[in-house]
Design a protein with these regions (language model features):
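Structured surface interface patches that mediate subunit assembly and partner/cofactor docking
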Residues: 1-7, 11-14, 21-34, 54-75, ...
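Extended, alpha-helix-rich binding/interface surfaces that flank or overlap catalytic cores
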Residues: 41
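Glycine-rich loop at the start of a catalytic domain that most often binds anionic cofactors/ligands
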Residues: 44-45
Length: 212
């Protein structure tokens, strides 16, 4: 399996681990996504898993779910379990399994994928998906009170891709502006900070040469 699909696989497994602590009673809990509670975040993640599986298997994504974490991003998720707490949680594992199967069956990395009005490759779709799924795994973990960090190795490998695939001009409606953190912040916290989250236990770093 190519590295792009391995990264997506690991991100999905991390997010599932975080979601394993969700319960129907927790679905109204706040999340790092300002306008979304845990239930909406889980439904959104399910929609994203469906879109990624569609992109990798049939090479076309009709609708790209809007990410949480940025202004104007509070649109309602459309997943089939969006109104059913127990089904929302259990359905996430089913949707993840479909995506992981699609990852295992992609023959290469340069197959074209139609995403809205753009033409990307399966590699780009997989890496972009890994970044989003990993950060939402962190969002879910924080919402559940566990604060399980993005695994260090996974975050270290995703950070260079995030810098390339999430430039400032593409952030509106997807991610908030980067949060400055101390230089010695862990890779997992640097990843979520780059994607607009304030890691637990960190303070805003003063901007300057060689910042975060």
């Amino acid at each position: 399996m190519r590295i792009e699909y391995r990264l997506l696989d690991r991100a999905v497994r991390y997010a599932l681990s975080a979601a394993g602590h969700a319960t129907p009673r927790r679905l109204t809990a706040a999340t790092p996504c300002p306008e979304w509670d845990l239930g909406r975040l889980l439904a959104h993640l399910g929609d994203s898993l469906d879109a990624l599986a569609e992109g990798l298997s049939v090479r076309s994504v009709g609708l790209v779910p809007t990410c949480c974490g940025a202004e104007g991003s509070a649109g309602a998720p459309s997943g089939p379990e969006a109104g059913d707490g127990e089904g929302l949680i259990t359905g996430l594992a089913v949707r993840a399994a479909v995506l992981l199967t699609a990852c295992a069956e992609v023959p290469g990395g340069q197959e074209p994928v139609a995403v809205g009005d753009q033409l990307l490759t399966t590699s780009v779709v997989a890496i972009t998906g890994a970044i989003e799924v990993a950060v939402h795994g962190w969002d879910i973990s924080v919402s559940c009170g566990d604060h399980e960090p993005v695994p260090s190795r996974l975050a270290t490998e995703l950070l260079p891709y995030a810098a390339l695939l999430v430039p400032r001009h593409t952030r509106p409606g997807l991610f908030a502006d980067p949060v400055l953190v101390p230089r010695r912040t862990s890779a997992g916290d640097r990843l979520v900070a780059f994607l607009g989250r304030q890691p637990a236990g960190t303070k805003m770093a003063a901007p300057g040469p060689g910042g975060s």
